[in-house]
From Swiss-Prot:
CDD domains with a match to the protein in the record: PRTases_typeI
Binding annotation for 5-phospho-alpha-D-ribose 1-diphosphate: R103, K104, K107, E129, D130, V131, T132, T133, S134, G135, G136, S137
Subunit structure: Homodimer.
GO molecular function: magnesium ion binding; orotate phosphoribosyltransferase activity
Catalytic activity: orotidine 5'-phosphate + diphosphate = orotate + 5-phospho-alpha-D-ribose 1-diphosphate
Biological role stated in the UniProt entry: Catalyzes the transfer of a ribosyl phosphate group from 5-phosphoribose 1-diphosphate to orotate, leading to the formation of orotidine monophosphate (OMP).
Name of the featured protein: Orotate phosphoribosyltransferase
Superkingdom of origin organism: Archaea
Name of a matching Pfam family: Pribosyltran
Cofactor(s) required for function per UniProt: Mg(2+)
Binding site for orotate: T133, R161
């Protein structure tokens, strides 16, 4: 028997609360004065890198992202170095989909590639991101993947700070899928 929309919605709400509790318990939510990657100042910081080093929290993230991926037409899980790599790796293990790591720049040694893993033009990727603010950090990775001929229509972020990333990604025909929003996390 399939679940109704209200059952699915309740399930996502329970999952969100489970993730919020895990993020707080592992110390990933901090208060103080911080400068974000976007250059913005903030009174709070969400340290998903800390969360990704906690096996219980990482497992919750991977499981919840995998459930979202079941609804998507994708065949590869991608993550941008550094923060996206443990997330994408855990999700790849959970979904058994291939992993692609997107480097921030080309290395001047070895394969001299922006990618670790196989990327084919027919691939349909979902990108994992730790925290989204303006969406600028992930936009470069999306463009590099698309320049290689692959398709990328979804970015799953653990936490969306709700500061424009969804709108910016929509302009690039990418749907932002947050596991939790900052407003929910900071309640």
């Amino acid at each position: 028997m399939s679940k109704t929309n209200s059952e699915t919605g309740n399930n996502f709400e329970q999952q969100k609360q489970e993730l919020i509790a895990a993020l707080k318990a592992c110390g990933a939510v901090r208060y103080g004065d911080f400068t974000l990657a976007s250059g913005k100042k903030s009174k709070y910081y969400i340290d998903i890198k800390k969360a990704s080093t906690d096996p219980k929290t990482l497992k919750i993230i991977a499981r919840q992202a995998a459930l979202r991926i079941k609804e998507m037409d994708v065949d590869t899980v991608a993550g941008v170095e550094l923060g996206g790599v443990p997330l994408a790796t855990a999700v790849s293990l959970e979904t058994e989909l291939p992993l692609l790591i997107v480097r921030k720049s080309v290395k001047d040694y070895g394969t001299k590639s922006r990618f670790v893993g196989d990327l084919k033009p027919e691939d349909r990727l979902v990108m994992l991101e730790d925290v989204t603010t303006s969406g600028g950090s992930v936009r470069d990775a999306i463009e590099v993947v698309r320049e290689a001929g692959a398709s990328l229509k979804y970015v799953i972020t653990v936490v969306d700070r709700e500061e424009g990333a969804g709108e910016k990604l929509k302009e690039a025909d990418v749907e932002l899928v947050p596991l939790v929003s900052a407003s929910d996390l900071l309640k």
